Amino acid sequence: MKYRFPKGMRPSTLRERESFYRYEFSLDRVEKWLGWRDIGNTAFAVIIGRHSDIYLPEYEDIKRKAVIIDEHKGLADVLDYILQYLPEGVYYDRNVYSDIKLCVERGCDYKNCWGCENFLGQELAFDIDPENVSCPYHGSIEDKMKRGEGLSFCMLEFKKVRKLTLSLYDELRAEYKKLRVVFSGRGFHIHVFDRKALKMSREERVELAKAYSHYAIDEWVTNGEMRLIRLPYSLNGLVSRICSPLSIEELPAFDPRNHSIPSFLLSSPRRSSRASSSRP
């Protein structure tokens, strides 16, 4: 499958993925992002090659699946899994559990957590992707899907979702105080860390997703159906861009052609500690 992206954006090779995670990926920054929750009780996941079709041959049978990492001793352990799989994407589970070991012992599929006594809530998030908006050149999401270009986008579409993200942020901050914006590699995520958002019921989330559907969000993220979200500071291997938290002041001028570019596209990566980033 061929994708259409803005200039300079392309799938990363296996060697480039390995280079990024060995020398540039910052465990310190990930730990800070997840600092509000118990990392030991957090599940992670990798998608090996679902969209890029670039993967280690031994993982062909699972290249399209989300491989859940729920038995780990911390972020260094998670990084070992990442280096094993060299995935196109890395994610974390927004669900908050009292004891994730109980989920593992019971063989939970994580799809029916809402009524479980071990489930404490879910981090609220909004996922605004450029393919969700209509484009005078490339059509609607339905048109793109028919052509097999569901994840493709142009700068016109990107600028539309950038504007929508700003508008959605402005509307959300009237209700919530702890908001963070993240460039996902293609579009944007808005994370809500207010406790009242964490405790929202599934029914409340469904209504909320419907209320904000005009912002080109993926409703299944906001309504709680999809619990995984891309891990900040990881590599979006489909477009070779770093998933990057942004201040709201940075958002209006953010351009994926010039920002969040990994070192392997700029120059030879500089060797650094596994727990430190070589980027400033």
Curated annotation (Swiss-Prot):
Pfam families: DNA_primase_S. One of its GO terms (molecular function) is DNA-directed RNA polymerase activity. Gene3D superfamilies: DNA primase, PRIM domain. SUPFAM superfamilies: Prim-pol domain. One of its GO terms (biological process) is DNA replication, synthesis of primer. Belongs to the eukaryotic-type primase small subunit family. This is Uncharacterized DNA primase small subunit-like protein AF_2298. It comes from Archaeoglobus fulgidus (strain ATCC 49558 / DSM 4304 / JCM 9628 / NBRC 100126 / VC-16).
